[in-house]
């Protein structure tokens, strides 16, 4: 896990790299902070440092962090790329992010993922998702299209009532081309 960056008192959080093979979020957050050191946002550039270093979805224990949250729909699953761990919140990264959320009590959370090119939301985040969609040109989807037991979105957005947006970036697009729309999204979040 990397350090928390930006404004540690912010009520808007942005999280990158739940999955190590989706490094776009880490890069975009780091680039944004180079030009906006006085940000109003709280950033966690990389939740899954091991995954990024090894270019794998899971953490060092083979757990998909986005299936490891203590939700009503968490299930013990087979050990594959979507393995949710031996039990909910078994991973240090999951405990870390839960602690930050509980401590900061954010009013909005944005997580950066890839590759689906959609703005997915959990909880009361449709309006802001539509504004993000207008910036990046991706459709807004309430469902990602498949089951996500133990996901962060379910834990934060549905069960804890914190509007949570999962921005699924285009992995085929050069990450440099994503800077302009994603930075505009960060600026939008700075002003809510």
Please name every model-derived segment.
Residues 1-2, 42, 166:
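Beta-strand secondary-structure signal
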Residues 1-10:
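Short beta-strand-to-loop junctions in surface cap/lid or active-site-entrance loops
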Residues 5, 32-36, 100, 156, ...:
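Hydrophobic helix-cap positions at the C-terminus of alpha-helices
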Residues 9-15, 21-145, 152, 162:
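Active-site/substrate-binding loop(s) of hydrolase catalytic cores
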Residues 121, 147-192:
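Active-site-adjacent mobile loop/cap segments within catalytic or ligand-binding domains
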């Amino acid at each position: 896990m990397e350090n928390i960056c930006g404004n540690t008192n912010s009520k808007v959080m942005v999280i990158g790299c739940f999955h190590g093979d989706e490094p776009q979020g880490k890069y975009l957050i780091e680039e944004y902070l180079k030009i906006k050191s006085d940000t109003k946002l709280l950033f966690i550039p990389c939740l899954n440092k091991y995954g990024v270093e090894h270019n794998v979805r899971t953490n060092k224990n083979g757990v998909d962090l986005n299936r490891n949250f203590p939700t009503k729909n968490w299930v013990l699953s087979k050990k594959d790329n979507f393995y949710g761990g031996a039990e909910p919140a078994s991973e240090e990264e999951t405990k870390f992010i839960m602690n930050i959320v509980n401590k900061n009590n954010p009013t909005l959370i944005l997580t950066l993922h890839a590759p689906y090119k959609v703005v997915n939301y959990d909880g009361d985040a449709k309006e802001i998702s539509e504004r993000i969609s207008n910036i990046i040109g991706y459709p807004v989807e309430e469902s990602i299209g498949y089951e996500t037991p133990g996901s962060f979105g379910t834990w934060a957005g549905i069960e804890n009532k914190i509007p949570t947006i999962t921005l699924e970036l285009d992995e085929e697009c050069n990450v440099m081309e994503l800077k302009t729309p994603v930075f505009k999204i960060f600026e939008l979040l700075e002003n809510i």
